[in-house]
Amino acid sequence: MDKKIKILTLGDHPLSASGIGTQTKYIIEGMLKTGKYSFFCLGGAMKHEKYDLVKFEEWGDDWQIQPIDGYGSQEILRSVMRGHKPDIIWFMTDPRFWGWLWHIENEIRALAPMVYYHVWDNFPAPTFNKKFYESNDFIATISKVTDKAVKAVSPSVASQYIPHVVDENIFKKYPDQEAAEFKSSGVIKEGNFVDKDGKQKFVFFWNNRNARRKQSGSVIFWFKEFLDRVGHDKASLIMHTDVKDPHGQDLEAIIASLGIMNGEVMFSTNKYPPETLAKLYNLADCTINVADAEGFGLATFESLACETPIIVTMTGGLQEQVTDGEEWFGIGLEPSSKAIIGSQEIPWIYEDRVAGKEVVDAMEAMYRMTQEEREELGKKGRNHVITNYNREEIMKKWDEVFTKLYNDLGSWENRKNYKAWEFKEIA
């Protein structure tokens, strides 16, 4: 290929710690290694110290990031389109952030195809998204639930299931000695991992945003009920989150009210590189996510790659992580209730709630397992990740998608198979 395929990405900054940023980075790096692509990224959704153009010594002009506020605007996009003339526009995250983009899709798609990497948490089928889905040339879906939803609402739009990936060379099982040293490193300052008998405590890990759907407060209350069963010195819960997130609960107030301030619940509030996060998963005996809605659930995915079993709600992308339909890699909790919630933007969607007693029972079941049983679950979990979410294979899928779109649909002077208008007969 004489000319490299130039892709413009919109979304979270590729170097940010968010799940969207992480996946964007994985995809860009995977495509750059083929030698066929160049990327210009509008990196948003974070507070920037400066707005200088970012380049990388390894990639030169083939990967440039322009920091922006929010996710951009029509004016910014028009300017970038004129200045860089991308062959493909790729964007990712919740549909509610892209109304401004789809509003001018007839203008943008006339120049280059639009690829939407989409997540949707649950059914009933979101028919209210139909106008959004049909404003794209291709939709990549991150979970099987998302894929079914898109195909149910807009079967005429080209779509394909392309799940998330993890860097299995970072998120992996570390030697026991290295994990032990990490426990005493002070990363978790309140770290008291030994019970009254001098034995190692059982450690649960929770790595999520402190937000309502993540059930952060419920997790603490349920963990306290679990401690009431097994003994308050027998286990600890590490919560990697912002305890004062304005979208969540005051978690410090909760543990104070429950009287569990002696190392039972420990907060990890700093932002860490992937290597440190991987060690946190290794430190834990089990990672838990009982959110009532979850598009994919990157934390439990990373946990499985580190051979740490999981407890999850059977919702969204979590349900395809905890089991492959035959084997289980932790404990999956079926929702005890399904409520239809919504808003003015999203009129309906299921909210999958789990019962507190079932969560506590699952915690106890994981706690009562032998170490060998948990290790077996963990090994199977990593094999599930490597086999069914193989990074190299998924990068091949992205390469195939981008190459086909470039060849079949073209861009700018060679744009094909798109009309910015349609003819309707008016009686």
Predicted features along the sequence, with ranges:
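Carbohydrate-associated surface elements
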Residues: 145, 165
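N-terminal subdomain of nucleotide-sugar transferases
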Residues: 1-55, 84, 424-427
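Short N-terminal targeting/anchoring amphipathic segment
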Residues: 78-98, 113-115
